[in-house]
C-alpha cells in the first residue's frame, strides 16, 4: 500500500477553494451540459431528483434497506412531500450521488446534481451560483470531543498547543483559524490541525478518538451526541464550542422553484422520534477498534516484525498492512483459533493456505507466509487494474479476504450499475456491501485500515528498534 501520511498544518493557513477541491474520493466523473442544470419543472419531467450527498455513513448510510444516515430520512420525507404536491400525478424518485463533503458544492456548480444535502455544517460563501436553503437544523455548535478519563476542557483557550484531527471539509477549520487569531493576541501557541486520511469520515475519526489513537476532534454537537450513544467512551465537551451555525441544504441560484419548495418543506418537517433506531441497531454491537500501540502490543509486534517484514517483502506488500490485519484478526496472538478452521496470527484457513501451496499454518512463519501469499494472489487475480489506486486495492483485497473475492467482484459490478465508482471501496462499493450483507465486511475493512493508519503514523519508531517508544495518550 502506498503510504499517504496525514498533512499537519497550522490552522492559520487557508483551506483550498471549492473549485480547486482535490478529487481524492470522487465517484465516476459525470459530464453534464449547463442546460441540464434544472429547476423543479424539469426535475418533475425527468422524474428524478439528483441529490449530492455527503458520502459519510453518518450522513447518507443505508444498511440492508434501513436508513442510518441523518440526511437519508430527511430526503425520504422530502421525496414524499414532492410527490404529495405533484399536480399532474408524476412521481419523482431520488437519485443519491455520494461524494466527499469538500466536493459537494463544486459538483453542484458543475451541474452534477440538483440539491446538496451534506448532513454537516458547510460553508458556501466561496461557491458561485449556489444558494443555501432554510436551516435544516438551526444553531448548531461545533464542540470538542475527547475520550472519557482524559483531561477535559472548559474554555477554547485551553486548546493552545493542542492538535485536532479533522476530516477534509470540516467546518471546524475556519473556527480554529479565528481561535488562533485570539490566541496570537495573547502570545499563546496556536491550535494545530492534522487532516486525516481521506478514507476516514467523521464517524471514523470519532471511533479513533474513543480508541485513543487520536486525542481530540471537533464536530457538530448533534453528530457528537448521536455517536456517543453507540461509543460510550466518547466525552463531549459542550462548554468548548468553537462556533455556531445552521445546517442547510443547497441549490443552484437559478433553481428558484426548487429552492422555494425545499424551504416550505423544511418549515414544517420534524425528525421522527425513532429516527435513530436503525442506526443504533446497526452500530450498537459492532466491532470497535482498540488502541494498538500500548506497551505490550508494541512488544509483541516487535517480536513478529522480522517475520512480517520478510513475507511482506516477498509479496511486495507493506508489512504494516500485515501487522494491522494481524491485530484485527488475533490481537497479535499466534495461538488464536477461530471458526471454520481459521488459525493463528492472521486467521488463515487450511483451504486458503492450500490454494497457495502452504501446508503448515500452525507456526508463525507458515501462518504469515500463507496469509501473505493468499492476499497477494487475491490482489493479483482480482484487483490488479491500474485504475485502482494502491489504497483502494488493499481495501478490496481485505474485503475479499473476509468475504470472498467473487462476492466482492459482484459488488463492484452492482456498484457500476448504480452509478458508483467500481474502483473505489471506501464510500462507494462499500455502500453496495452495506445494502447486501450489512456492516460486517465494511467494519472489517475499516478496522484494519484504522490500525494501519495508527501504525503508519508511528512507522519510524516501529521500524527502528533504537527509536522505539510508548506513545503517551495524555
Identify what each model region corresponds to.
Residues 22-124, 128, 195-200, 220, ...:
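Extracytoplasmic small-molecule ligand-binding "clamshell" domains
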Residues 24-43, 69-81, 147-173, 223, ...:
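Extended ligand-binding regions for polar small-molecule ligands
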Residues 50-59, 64-85, 141-200, 295-307:
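Bilobed "Venus flytrap"/periplasmic-binding protein-like clamshell domains
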Residues 76, 87-158, 222-226, 231-243, ...:
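Acidic, polar ligand-binding/catalytic clefts
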Residues 284-331, 365-368, 382-386:
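Export/targeting segments at the very N-terminus of extracytoplasmic proteins
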Residues 392-459:
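Catalytic and substrate-binding regions of cell-wall glycan-acting enzymes that process beta-1,4-linked
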Amino acid at each position: 500500500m502506498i503510504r499517504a501520511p496525514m498533512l499537519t498544518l497550522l490552522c492559520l493557513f487557508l483551506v483550498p477553494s471549492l473549485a480547486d477541491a482535490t478529487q481524492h474520493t470522487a465517484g465516476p466523473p459525470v459530464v453534464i451540459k449547463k442546460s441540464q442544470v434544472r429547476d423543479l419543472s424539469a426535475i418533475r419531467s425527468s422524474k428524478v431528483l439528483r441529490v449530492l450527498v455527503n458520502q459519510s455513513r453518518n450522513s447518507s448510510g443505508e444498511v440492508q434497506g434501513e436508513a442510518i444516515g441523518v440526511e437519508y430520512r430527511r430526503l425520504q420525507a422530502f421525496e414524499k412531500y414532492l410527490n404529495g404536491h405533484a399536480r399532474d400525478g408524476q412521481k419523482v424518485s431520488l437519485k443519491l450521488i455520494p461524494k466527499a463533503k469538500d466536493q459537494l458544492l463544486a459538483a453542484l456548480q458543475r451541474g452534477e446534481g440538483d440539491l446538496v444535502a451534506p448532513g454537516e455544517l458547510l460553508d458556501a460563501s466561496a461557491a458561485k451560483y449556489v444558494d443555501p436553503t432554510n436551516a435544516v437544523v438551526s444553531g448548531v455548535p461545533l464542540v470538542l470531543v475527547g475520550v472519557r478519563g482524559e483531561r477535559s476542557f472548559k474554555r477554547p483557550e485551553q486548546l493552545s498547543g493542542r492538535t485536532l484531527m479533522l476530516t477534509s471539509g470540516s467546518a471546524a477549520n475556519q473556527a480554529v483559524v479565528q481561535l488562533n487569531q485570539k490566541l496570537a493576541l495573547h502570545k499563546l501557541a496556536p491550535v494545530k490541525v492534522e487532516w486525516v486520511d481521506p478514507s476516514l469520515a467523521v464517524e471514523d475519526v470519532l471511533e479513533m478518538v474513543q480508541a485513543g489513537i487520536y486525542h481530540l476532534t471537533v464536530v457538530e454537537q448533534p453528530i457528537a451526541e448521536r455517536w456517543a450513544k453507540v461509543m460510550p467512551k466518547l466525552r463531549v465537551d459542550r462548554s468548548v464550542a468553537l462556533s455556531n451555525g445552521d445546517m442547510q441544504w443547497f441549490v443552484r441560484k437559478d433553481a428558484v422553484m426548487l429552492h422555494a419548495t425545499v424551504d416550505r418543506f423544511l418549515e414544517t418537517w420534524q425528525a421522527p422520534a425513532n429516527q435513530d433506531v436503525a442506526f443504533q441497531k446497526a452500530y450498537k454491537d459492532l466491532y470497535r477498534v482498540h488502541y494498538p500501540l500500548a506497551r505490550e502490543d508494541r512488544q509483541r509486534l516487535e517480536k513478529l516484525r522480522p517475520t512480517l517484514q520478510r513475507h511482506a517483502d516477498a509479496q511486495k506488500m507493506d508489512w504494516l498492512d500485515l501487522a494491522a490485519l494481524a491485530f484485527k484478526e488475533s490481537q497479535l496472538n499466534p495461538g488464536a483459533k477461530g471458526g471454520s478452521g481459521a488459525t493463528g496470527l492472521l486467521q488463515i484457513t487450511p483451504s486458503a493456505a492450500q490454494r497457495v501451496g502452504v501446508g503448515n499454518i500452525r507456526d508463525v512463519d507458515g501462518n504469515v507466509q500463507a496469509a501473505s501469499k493468499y492476499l497477494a494472489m487475491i490482489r493479483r487475480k482480482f484487483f490488479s487494474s491500474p485504475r485502482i489506486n494502491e489504497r483502494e486495492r488493499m481495501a478490496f483485497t481485505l474485503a475479499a479476504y473476509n468475504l470472498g473475492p467473487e462476492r466482492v467482484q459482484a459488488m463492484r459490478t452492482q456498484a457500476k450499475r448504480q452509478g458508483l465508482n467500481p474502483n473505489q471501496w471506501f464510500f462507494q462499493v462499500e455502500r453496495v456491501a452495506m445494502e447486501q450483507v450489512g456492516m460486517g465486511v465494511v467494519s472489517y475493512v475499516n478496522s484494519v485500515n484504522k490500525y494501519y493508519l495508527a501504525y503508519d503514523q508511528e512507522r519510524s519508531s516501529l521500524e527502528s528498534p533504537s527509536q522505539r517508544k510508548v506513545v503517551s495518550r495524555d
